[in-house]
Amino acid sequence: MAKNIAKALLDIEAVSLSPNDLFTWSSGIKSPIYCDNRITLGYPEVRNAIRDGLIQLIKEHFSNVEIISGTATAGIPHAAYISEKMELPMNYVRSKSKSHGKQNQIEGAKSENKNVVVVEDLISTGGSSITAVEALEEAGANVLGVVAIFTYGLAKADETFNKAHIPFYTLSDYNELIEVAKDDGKISLNDIQTLVDWRDNLS
């Protein structure tokens, strides 16, 4: 499954590799990879494969889940697809509380005393995932873990999740993506070393 998802992300250009002309992330980090999983929403076959893959992860690792929770904004549609097929309640978590109305950070199903799985699109350092987890826990939820489409495989993410005592699972990862890109002739051996060095240095 990891290989198929990686290939799909590359084919629809939800993930782009550019070892010799770096992208600039919003954080300012210069990177040979750019990931925008929102593009998957425009490809029903891909988004359905993602939905079914994430459901498989949830059933395998978090079978006692009661609520599916999406991270705003990119995790929301995938959480919706999952909750619909699993026939489970859903909510979503903002990065911070609204400044008006009831100032809610969590919208949708009530999480108190419920087993919740958080759905992310992408894990880089894990910071946004854990922000959502902490908001849910403050609301009384029992967060079982996090599932996501893709991870860069940074050591920082492992540290972040381990510190919070929250497990996470992804459909595909950076290593798989590099392997697929190599097999498809999209990158050279020199490119592979550049990509590996970038990730290792960032970790």
UniProtKB/Swiss-Prot annotation:
Pathway: Pyrimidine metabolism; UMP biosynthesis via de novo pathway; UMP from orotate: step 1/2. The keyword Transferase applies. PROSITE patterns: PUR_PYR_PR_TRANSFER (PS00103). Its cofactor is Mg(2+). GO terms for biological process: 'de novo' UMP biosynthetic process; pyrimidine nucleobase biosynthetic process. GO terms for molecular function: magnesium ion binding; orotate phosphoribosyltransferase activity. Keywords: Glycosyltransferase, Magnesium, Pyrimidine biosynthesis, Transferase. It catalyses: orotidine 5'-phosphate + diphosphate = orotate + 5-phospho-alpha-D-ribose 1-diphosphate. Orotate binds at residue 124. 5-phospho-alpha-D-ribose 1-diphosphate binds at residues 94, 98, 100, 120-128. Its EC number is 2.4.2.10. It is an enzyme of class 2 (transferase). InterPro entries: OPRT, Or_phspho_trans_dom, PRibTrfase_dom, PRTase-like. The keyword Amino-acid biosynthesis does not apply. Homodimer. PANTHER family: OROTATE PHOSPHORIBOSYLTRANSFERASE, URIDINE 5'-MONOPHOSPHATE SYNTHASE. Catalyzes the transfer of a ribosyl phosphate group from 5-phosphoribose 1-diphosphate to orotate, leading to the formation of orotidine monophosphate (OMP). HAMAP family: PyrE. Belongs to the purine/pyrimidine phosphoribosyltransferase family. PyrE subfamily. This is Orotate phosphoribosyltransferase. It comes from Staphylococcus epidermidis (strain ATCC 35984 / DSM 28319 / BCRC 17069 / CCUG 31568 / BM 3577 / RP62A). The gene is pyrE.
